[in-house]
């Protein structure tokens, strides 16, 4: 007799994705981050909806509405802090998830990978819009600096900047549209996520050995669902500990001041999870070149399926590529650190060196793997 989870049209879809999904028996903890990203997205949407009920998207009262949420709304302080630190957790999981896919060459599943990179852009856009909403000093100047980069586009630049701003400066129309886009994008991300999962379940998951696992798969539940629950408990515990013990650790002190167009902060910088891209932007002396490098810092991930033709699936079989990969991870960490430093020597030359090294990885890595395959033959 068929159970309801196998017969009901809607429940059957969920069942085939979460319960009876055939999963490789040997996938490790590194495969947990997909479900953790889903959890982060749900957490952000739930906390965001409650914040939107009390937030006012008007430059005269936006900052005060945040103060109102923190002081007067029942548990508003907790909701806001979980939402702010949840974004950091989201990006930690996102970067670990991306790093794992690069290491194990999961980008060979081209449709899934392409959709994943598009989702990364959408999440980055959502986070940037959200950073502007408190209308503190760093919110205002961050929005001014980043949106002003559009002016580097030939011919259309100035028109695009004024179109995004809704005027001749970052002002009320800018805040209103940023709030609207910040509210809508997560729902677009949910749609993209479903497409991402659809593509993934067409081919099945990769595994640490990089071998075809069709002969040796088990249902996702109960083993992997309980395994994912361990990850959920760990990251949610970490999020709560951070939010309750040191809630503003990852924020910027400048944002405790209301936005003032007449006073420029000493060091304008985005949130920590964008600092690697910001360091790449700053390392190019030319404005247009910097914008191109900024976009390429993430969009270069699109070329990985085209440039990397490994005979074996995954860096675990390529010792020199493993070294290259961990050097690349260290480059990203160092770029993040450089992005938070002032624009002065020796940080300028260090940023330029690290930027060159960052992009060289995507050129050298396929060449080294080709040489290794050639030697094995």
Curated annotation (Swiss-Prot):
Location of the protein in the cell: Mitochondrion inner membrane
InterPro entries: Cyt_b/b6_C, Cyt_b/b6_C_sf, Cyt_b/b6_N, Cytb/b6-like_sf, Cytochrome_b, Cytochrome_b_C_euk/bac, Cytochrome_b_N_euk/bac, Di-haem_cyt_TM
GO biological process per UniProt: mitochondrial electron transport, ubiquinol to cytochrome c
Required co-factors: heme b
GO MF term list: metal ion binding; ubiquinol-cytochrome-c reductase activity
Keywords: Electron transport, Heme, Iron, Membrane, Metal-binding, Mitochondrion, Mitochondrion inner membrane, Respiratory chain, Transmembrane, Transmembrane helix, Transport, Ubiquinone
Coiled-coil ranges per UniProt: none
Residues the record lists as binding a ubiquinone: 201
Binding positions (heme b b562): 83, 182
GO cellular component, one term: respiratory chain complex III
Keyword Transmembrane helix: yes
Transmembrane portions of the chain: 33-53, 77-98, 113-133, 178-198, 226-246, 288-308, 320-340, 347-367
Oligomer and partners: The main subunits of complex b-c1 are: cytochrome b, cytochrome c1 and the Rieske protein.
Record's miscellaneous remark: Heme 1 (or BL or b562) is low-potential and absorbs at about 562 nm, and heme 2 (or BH or b566) is high-potential and absorbs at about 566 nm.
Protein family: Belongs to the cytochrome b family.
Function per UniProt: Component of the ubiquinol-cytochrome c reductase complex (complex III or cytochrome b-c1 complex) that is part of the mitochondrial respiratory chain. The b-c1 complex mediates electron transfer from ubiquinol to cytochrome c. Contributes to the generation of a proton gradient across the mitochondrial membrane that is then used for ATP synthesis.
Protein name: Cytochrome b
Organism: Tetrodontophora bielanensis
Protein encoded by which gene: MT-CYB
């Amino acid at each position: 007799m068929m159970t309801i989870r196998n017969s009901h049209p809607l429940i059957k879809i969920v069942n085939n994705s979460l319960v009876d999904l055939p999963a490789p028996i040997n996938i490790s903890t590194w495969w947990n981050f997909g479900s953790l990203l889903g959890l982060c997205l749900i957490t952000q949407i739930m906390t965001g909806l409650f914040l939107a009920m009390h937030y006012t998207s008007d430059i005269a009262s936006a900052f005060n509405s945040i103060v109102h949420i923190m002081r007067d709304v029942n548990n508003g302080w907790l909701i806001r802090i979980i939402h702010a630190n949840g974004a950091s957790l989201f990006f930690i999981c996102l970067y670990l998830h991306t790093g794992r896919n690069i290491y194990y060459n999961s980008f060979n599943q081209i449709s899934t990978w392409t959709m994943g990179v598009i989702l990364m852009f959408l999440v980055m856009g959502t986070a940037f819009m959200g950073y502007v909403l408190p209308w503190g000093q760093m919110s205002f100047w961050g929005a001014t600096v980043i949106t002003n980069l559009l002016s580097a586009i030939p011919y259309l630049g100035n028109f695009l900047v004024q179109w995004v701003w809704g005027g001749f400066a970052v002002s009320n129309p800018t805040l209103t549209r940023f709030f609207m886009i910040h509210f809508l994008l997560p729902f677009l991300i949910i749609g993209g996520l479903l497409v991402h999962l659809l593509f993934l379940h067409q081919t099945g998951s990769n595994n640490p050995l990089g071998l075809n696992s069709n002969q040796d798969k088990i249902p996702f539940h109960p083993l992997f669902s309980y395994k994912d629950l361990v990850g959920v408990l760990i990251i949610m515990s970490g999020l709560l500990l951070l939010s309750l013990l040191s809630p503003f650790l990852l924020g910027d002190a400048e944002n405790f001041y209301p936005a003032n167009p007449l006073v420029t902060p000493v060091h304008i910088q985005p949130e920590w999870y964008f600092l690697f891209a910001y360091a790449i932007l700053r390392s190019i002396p030319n404005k247009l070149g910097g914008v191109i490098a900024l976009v390429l810092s993430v969009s270069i991930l699109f070329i990985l399926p085209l440039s990397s033709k490994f005979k074996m699936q995954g860096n675990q079989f390529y010792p020199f590529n493993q070294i290259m990969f961990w050097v690349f991870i260290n480059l990203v960490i160092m770029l993040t650190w450089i992005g938070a430093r002032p624009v002065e020597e020796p940080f300028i030359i260090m940023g330029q060196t690290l930027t060159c090294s960052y992009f060289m990885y995507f050129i050298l890595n396929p060449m080294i793997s080709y040489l290794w395959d050639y030697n094995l033959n």
